[in-house]
């Protein structure tokens, strides 16, 4: 049996109105992946005579978006010759940041859309920085709206230089910068004849070359629990996605912070593992599984617990401990000061955390310290802070286990900040 094509998750980022939705629309339109209900509507309206108009489709997508029905552009799939690609999100969704961090959807690559008319804008920088903070290591740049600058090579080069500077400063290397017009269909799926001066890949060709995501099988086992079920004849079945490591039948695993909270090890031997209703001897990173553990009951564990081997258990941060983190403030109405206690979302857990110290304010582009011990931090700032959880939780330093080292900070129904754990300080 031929090896299945690798699955790759991508996010679209970039400044508002630079053409993210149109680019996604064009990708789907030219690969014949427009949602069924839209095509049906088009045919019902007797619009057959007209050539199937891209503009009409984009209007429908936009209408549905404005009515609050996201045509799930989130989780839209299409194929390239060597990849299955899922567009897991596009900003503009309120929970974009939270989804990127806590979702079952860690993005493997980002497509940064920059309008040739405007060049790099504030959100271009913010989104690029966010992609970096969230550990998206592969980026593709689409310089859009080339039709609006008459397909001018000089203008493309100016914008390409701006973006390249920004991305190199953030540590990105080897990224394609592609001149496109999503509206006209140039260099998205079909090669453009209007820019003979460009001989690089189209957007879809660049997507086809996204490196296959590596499975972190050599890292310690971590399975954040999403739900816990009781199944007749089997017993308690925790369900979750293997983030790192390998789980085998017969392994002895422990759950945290459950063990810390109950002051006794919640642990046992793995009796069975199931995926898509089939039993399997082992599970690898990316697998969504249910598994049964001898001696672990339904009331012992819950969503937000993390399973690991007893030989290398998940790291617990208790209220007497603190952790140092680097954050970027995305959206706070006033300013964050010491004592602020919002809710931290990481993997499948949510715990209120208190800002204990503001150690330094950073230049978001270079990471250099611009101010020690600031009195406050506000929207747009990047900072090193010390946080203390109000109850025990599992979180890991991002250098060791990036999958469990990133978090979102939420308050008043919005994502206030995104960050990553630098180190953990154990209290006495």
Swiss-Prot record:
Q: Where is the tr-type G domain?
A: 5-217
Residue ranges of region G4? 144-147
MF terms from GO for this chain are:
GTP binding; GTPase activity; translation elongation factor activity
- Keyword tags: Cytoplasm, Elongation factor, GTP-binding, Hydrolase, Magnesium, Metal-binding, Nucleotide-binding, Protein biosynthesis
The entry's localization annotation reads: Cytoplasm
Primary residence: cytoplasm
Question: Where along the chain is GTP bound?
Answer: 14-21, 89-93, 144-147
The annotated region (G3) lies at: 89-92
Question: Could you confirm whether the keyword Nucleotide-binding appears in this record?
Answer: yes
Q: Which PROSITE patterns match?
A: G_TR_1, G_TR_2
Catalysis performed (reactions)? GTP + H2O = GDP + phosphate + H(+)
In which residues is Mg(2+) bound?
A: 21
Please give the residue ranges the record annotates as the region G2: 68-72
The record's EC number reads 3.6.5.3
Q: Name one Pfam family in it.
A: GTP_EFTU_D2
**InterPro entries hit by this protein:** EFTu-like_2 (IPR004161), G_TR_CS (IPR031157), GTP-eEF1A_C (IPR054696), P-loop_NTPase (IPR027417), Small_GTP-bd (IPR005225), T_Tr_GTP-bd_dom (IPR000795), TRAFAC_GTPase_members (IPR050100), Transl_B-barrel_sf (IPR009000)
Residue segments, region G5? 181-183
Q: What is its EC class?
A: hydrolase
Q: Where is this region: G1?
A: 14-21
Q: Does the record carry Transit peptide as a key word?
A: no
Matching PANTHER family:
TRANSLATION FACTOR
Please explain the role this protein plays, according to its UniProt record. Answer: GTP hydrolase that promotes the GTP-dependent binding of aminoacyl-tRNA to the A-site of ribosomes during protein biosynthesis.
Tell me which family the UniProt entry assigns to this protein.
Belongs to the TRAFAC class translation factor GTPase superfamily. Classic translation factor GTPase family. EF-Tu/EF-1A subfamily.
Q: Which NCBIfam families does its entry note?
A: EF-1_alpha, PRK12317.1, small_GTP
- What protein is this chain from? Elongation factor 1-alpha
Provenance organism = Thermococcus sibiricus (strain DSM 12597 / MM 739)
**Native organism taxonomy:** Archaea, Methanobacteriati, Methanobacteriota, Thermococci, Thermococcales
């Amino acid at each position: 049996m031929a090896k299945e094509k690798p699955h790759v998750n991508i996010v679209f980022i970039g400044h508002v109105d630079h053409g993210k939705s149109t680019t996604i629309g064009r990708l789907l339109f030219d690969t014949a992946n427009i949602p069924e209900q839209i095509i049906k509507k088009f045919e019902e309206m007797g619009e057959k005579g007209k050539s199937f108009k891209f503009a009409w489709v984009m209007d429908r997508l936009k209408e549905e978006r404005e009515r609050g029905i996201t045509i799930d552009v989130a989780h839209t799939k299409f194929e390239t010759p060597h990849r299955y690609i899922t567009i897991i999100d596009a900003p503009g969704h309120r929970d974009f940041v939270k989804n990127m961090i806590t979702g079952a959807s860690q993005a493997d690559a980002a497509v940064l859309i920059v309008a040739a008319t405007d060049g790099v804008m504030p959100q271009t920088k913010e989104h690029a920085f966010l992609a970096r903070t969230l550990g998206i290591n592969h980026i593709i740049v689409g310089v859009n709206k080339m039709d609006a600058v008459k397909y001018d090579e000089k203008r493309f080069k100016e914008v390409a230089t701006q973006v390249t500077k920004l991305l190199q400063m953030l540590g990105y290397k080897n990224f394609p910068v592609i001149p496109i017009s999503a509206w006209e269909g140039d260099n998205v799926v079909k090669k453009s004849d209007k820019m003979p001066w460009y001989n690089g890949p189209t957007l879809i060709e660049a997507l086809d070359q996204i490196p296959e995501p590596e499975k972190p099988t050599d890292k310690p086992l971590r399975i954040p629990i999403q739900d816990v079920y009781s199944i007749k004849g089997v017993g308690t079945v925790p369900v979750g996605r293997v983030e790192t490591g390998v789980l085998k039948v017969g392994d002895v695993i422990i759950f945290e912070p459950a063990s810390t909270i109950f002051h006794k090890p919640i642990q046992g031997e793995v009796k069975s593992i199931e995926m898509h209703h089939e039993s399997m001897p082992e599970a690898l990173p990316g697998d969504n599984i249910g598994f049964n553990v001898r001696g672990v009951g339904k009331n012992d564990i819950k969503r937000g617990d993390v399973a690991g081997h007893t030989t290398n258990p998940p790291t617990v941060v208790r209220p007497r401990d603190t952790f140092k983190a680097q954050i970027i403030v995305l959206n706070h109405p006033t300013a964050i000061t010491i004592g602020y206690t919002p809710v931290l979302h990481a993997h499948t857990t949510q715990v209120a955390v208190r800002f204990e110290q503001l150690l330094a304010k950073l230049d978001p582009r270079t990471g250099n310290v611009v101010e020690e011990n600031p009195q406050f931090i506000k929207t747009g700032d990047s900072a090193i802070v010390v946080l203390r959880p109000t109850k025990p939780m599992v979180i890991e330093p991002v250098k060791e286990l990036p999958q469990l080292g990133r978090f979102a900070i939420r308050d008043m129904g919005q994502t206030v900040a995104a960050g990553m754990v630098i180190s953990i300080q154990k209290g006495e």
